[in-house]
């Protein structure tokens, strides 16, 4: 397993841990709000890392691999949806941190993020390792 994949998995584990912590805490408490902000920063940093180090490698390989190109297209569309809904959630929290629908929204967003991480690790990570092992 490459160092990049190890780092990527570690970032995923940290994101999943913070998601779990927020779910276990009172989301309206000071600690819950602090964890939400930690989650937001972690997600932003992780997405930037993926955009700089992970997806360029896969996009280059997809130039000659139509199956991978199709898979990346679907993942990109999915990520656009998740990112938009996650940004909307954090805007809602910033504007009304005590909104009664915040806990339910967070559970929904958490499920989307967890599902995305699972799919990335089980599909894209394997593709990345396949591509980088050919070099």
Task: Report the location of each language-model feature.
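Small-residue-biased structural context
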Residues: 1-135
């Amino acid at each position: 397993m490459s160092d990049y994949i190890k780092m990527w998995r570690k970032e995923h584990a940290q994101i999943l841990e913070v998601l779990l912590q927020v779910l276990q805490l009172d989301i309206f408490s000071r600690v819950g709000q602090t964890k939400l902000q930690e989650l937001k920063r972690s997600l932003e940093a992780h997405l930037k890392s993926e955009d700089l180090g992970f997806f360029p490698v896969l996009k280059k390989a997809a130039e000659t691999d139509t199956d991978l190109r199709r898979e990346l297209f679907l993942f990109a569309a999915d990520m656009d949806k998740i990112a938009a809904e996650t940004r909307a959630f954090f805007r809602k929290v910033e504007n009304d941190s005590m909104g009664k629908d915040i806990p339910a929204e967070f559970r929904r967003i958490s499920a989307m993020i967890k599902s995305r991480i699972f799919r990335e690790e089980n599909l894209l990570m394997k593709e990345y390792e396949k591509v980088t092992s050919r070099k």
